[in-house]
Amino acid sequence: MEENRKKIWKNHWICNPKFEDLKPLPTLHKQQDPTFRKPEHRKDLKNIHTLFRKKLKIEAGTKRVRMDISADDYYKLYINGQYVTQGPANSYAFCYYYNQIDITDYLQEGENILAVHVYYQGLVNRAYNSGDYRQGMIAEVWADGVSLIDDVWKYKEAEEYGASGTIAYETQFDEIIDERKKAVGWKMPEYDDSGWKTAPIRENDDHELILQPTKNLEMEHRVPLHIKKIEDGYLLDFGEDLTGTFAMKANGKSGDIITIRCGEELLSEVQVRNELRCNCLYEDKWILKEGENELEEFEYKCFRYVQLTTESSAELWDFHVDYRHYPFDDSSCTYHSEDALIGQIWEICKNAVRNCSQEAFLDCPHREKGQYLGDLTVTAHAFYCLTGDTDLFRKALFDFAHSTVVCEGMMAVAPGSFMQEIADFSLLYAYQLLLYYRCSKDLETLRKLLPVAEGIEWYFDRFQRFDGMIENVKTKWNLVDWPENLRDDYDFDLPQPVVGDGCHNVINALYVGMKKCMEEIRDLLQIEYQPQYAALRKTFIRAFYCEETGLFVDSVVSSHSSLHANAFAAFYGLYPENNQIADLIRKKGLCCGVFVSYFVLYGLLNLGEKELAYELITNKSEHSWYNMIREGATTAFEAWGKDQKWNTSLCHAWASAPIPVLMEMEQQN
C-alpha cells in the first residue's frame, strides 16, 4: 500500500543489549478473540531510557546533510547539544515510520556529535505500539549522495529515570528523576564517553520501515502568565491547557526533592488539582544533585497549572513548557464573526484541535493519547478548516488502513498495541475518505484506499437480514453515543462489548450512509458497480420511519424516537419529505454527547435549518459550548460539562464541530 515510501537501508537496527536476543511479543488481536492470551512482559524491561552517541565528521564544502532516523518506541535527537527533533509517529512494526530530516544547520565543519535518547515504555496502550520487546534505533546520514556514518554507536542506559506507577489507562509512567545518576553533558561533543559500550546490532529485526508522510512536531517555548510564591514553593499558571513537558532549573543540595504536580484546574488559590477528572494523577519527583540542575522530563502531559513544592531551600527558576503540536498555521483561515460568544467557542475548539493534533489526531493528550477512528471525523475536518493541511488526515486514513491486518472491519484505535473495536466508527471510514477527497482533491489516495473501504463494506454485509438491514453486529461494540447517559434514552440494549439481539437504527443509518459514500467514491473513480444505496434507503425508511410522528424510531420493535435515531438519518439524507426531524431537534436540543453534535448540526444543514444549527451552537443550556466556557474551559471538553461524565477530559478535539459547521454555513450564505 505504501511501497513507494520504503527504502533499502545500508545500516542496521541497533538496541540496548537487554533486548538483543528477545523475540517480539504478539500484541495484535481481535478485541474479543477468546484464544488470545496477553503475553507476560518482564517488569525489569519496562520504562527503559537508552542513550546513544556517535561522532560525525563534516568535510569543508559540504552543502546539504540529510538524516534518516527511526526508533522504537520513540527518540529525541540532539546534535552538538542542541535539540533537533523527535519521533517517529506511532506505527505498527510491519509499516514502521522513519523520519527524514535536513540537519545541515545543526552541523559544523569537522567533528560533530549525534546524541539520541531512545525510550522504550513496555506498556500495552493506545499511545505507543509498545509492550512487544521491539526496542532500539536505526540511523543513516547522507551528504551529496555519500553515506557519512556506519551503525557503530556507543550506548549507555540512562539511570536517572524511575517511576512509582502508571498514569490513566497505563498510558505512561510517572517520572522520578534523580539528577545524581544523570550522565551530565552527554549530548555535548566534549563529553567523555570512553566508558560507554558499543551498541549491538539486533539481528533479525522485523521492522519494515516506511518514510513518515507528515512533518515532525513543532515546539513552542511557553512561560507562565502568572507565578505565585506559596509557602513551600510556587504555583504556576500558563493561562490555558498546553500539551508538552514542563521544564525548569534549580540550584540546591544533593538529595533535595522537588515535587511537581500538574493539573487542568485548581483546588484552591494555592493548590493544583493534580488528580485530573480524566483519571490522570500528575505527580512527579525531581531529586537534585549538588549545584545547578536542569529538569528534563521525557513524556508529555496536558495541563494548565504546575505546583512546585519542596522542604528544601533550593532556588527554583526558568519555568517553562515545551509546548508540542503538529505544525499549525491558521493564518489563512478567514472565518470571522462579530458574535463574541462565537469567538469564544471558536477559540476553545481551535485550542483543543491544536493540542490533540500531535503525530496523529489524538482523542485527548492525557488519558488515552490514542487516535480514534470516530473522533477523526470531527478533528481532521476542523484541522483542515483551520489550517488547510490534509497531510495528517491522509496519514490517519492509512494508519487505520494498516489496522485491517488485525480485522478487515477495521480497528477503532490505530496505531497502538491496545485493541479496541467499535462498529459505528468503522462505518464512518467511507465518509472520511470522501471528506478527505473534498478537502484535498487527491484522487490517487482515494483509489489506493478503496479496497480498504470495500473490505469494511463486505465485513458488515455479512450481518444483513432478509430486507438488507443489518442486525446482531456482535463482533464490535455498537456505540451509538458516549457517554451512555447522553444517548437520549435510546431504546436498544447496548452492553459493551456485545450488543443485544435485534435490528436497531443508528448502526443501520451508518451502514446505509456508508453505502451512499461508497457509491460516490466509485463514481469519482469511474468504477462500475451494482447500485444498492437507493434501495437500502427505502428499506431503512420502511424499517424505522413512523408516518404518524414523522420521525425515525430507535429499533424495528420500538416506538421511541431518540435524537440519535433522527440525527444520523438527517446527516446522510435518509429522511422522507414532510418529516418532523427539525422540530424534534428544536425540542430536544443537544441531548447527546459532544461527538454526536457534529452529525446533529450537519443534519440540520441538510434539512435547510441553518438558523437552528446556529442556535444550537450558541445555546446556553447545560448541553452547550457556552457551558464549557462558563466552567472555565480554555480547550473544548469531552462532555458538555465537567460533571457530565465520570472521567471528563477537559481537552478533547471531538468537541470541535462548530469550526467546520460555521465555515460551511458561511460558504452557504
What are these regions (language model features)?
Residues 122, 371-669:
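Active-site core of glycosidic bond-cleaving carbohydrate-active enzymes
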